[in-house]
Amino acid sequence: MVDDGSTDGSSAVCADMAVADPRFRLLRQENAGVSAARNAALTLAGGKYLQFVDGDDRIHPQATETLVHAAEAMGADLVLSHFYRVDGERQAVRGHIKGERLLTRQEFAREMVKAPANYYYGVLWNKLYRRSIVESRGLRFEREVAWGEDFLFNLEYIRSVRLVAAVPRPLYYYIKRPGSLVSTQATLRRTIEMKRTTFDYYKDLYQDLDLYDEQKAKVYRYLISTACLLYTSD
């Protein structure tokens, strides 16, 4: 657990948990942003797998058990699940790959490009990663990237996976909060810049997988969505 300069009582709660259960480790640091906090956690992490949880969301009590079981039973390097999107009193299941499936890296890439901007693929918190892959590739989060650093991390991680397991069960509660990333012109500009950067990562990934010629039209669909976002904001 990383306390990234919190100002409420959450640090004390985490400290009590760390005392009560040695599996929990607490790191306190001055506020440096989400990427710095995640990188600090990766440096301290041990064990076989990595799982991320945002501080103001919730996970299903059986989330970790379910994801680890899928990884072990299927020999997967990446496991991802459906999730709940919670907006006030409303709760909806979100996901993309249907049913329980085991996919090769190329098969997964073909599924991902069908919905390249989908949270299901871009976020960290509905996934389980092998720590050995993260460390062998030296993967860390880009501190200078203001938004979408998790998507870039995922696109880099996928390069090294052999098999991907999809679990259709929703195991995470993503709490929708007031406000929008594109509510101001400044954040809109950052969003567009991030989408352009993500497009470059996408293009490089599909070229490395020898899928670019096959999937070129779908890859460029992501870039076109960026142009549409800019046009509709004028």
Predicted regions and their residues:
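A conserved acidic beta->alpha catalytic loop
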Residues: 3-12
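Active-site acidic Asp-centered loop
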Residues: 4, 53-55
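Short, conserved active-site loop motifs that form the nucleotide-linked donor/cofactor pocket
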Residues: 24
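Glycine-rich, basic loop-to-helix element that forms the pyrophosphate-binding segment
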Residues: 29-45
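Donor-binding/catalytic cores of nucleotide-activated saccharide
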Residues: 34, 55-165, 172-190
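Short aromatic/hydrophobic "clamp" motif used to bind/position activated sugar donors
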Residues: 50
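Amphipathic alpha-helical repeat scaffolds of TPR domains
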Residues: 220-228
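Conserved small/polar residues in nucleotide/adenosyl-binding loops
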Residues: 231-234
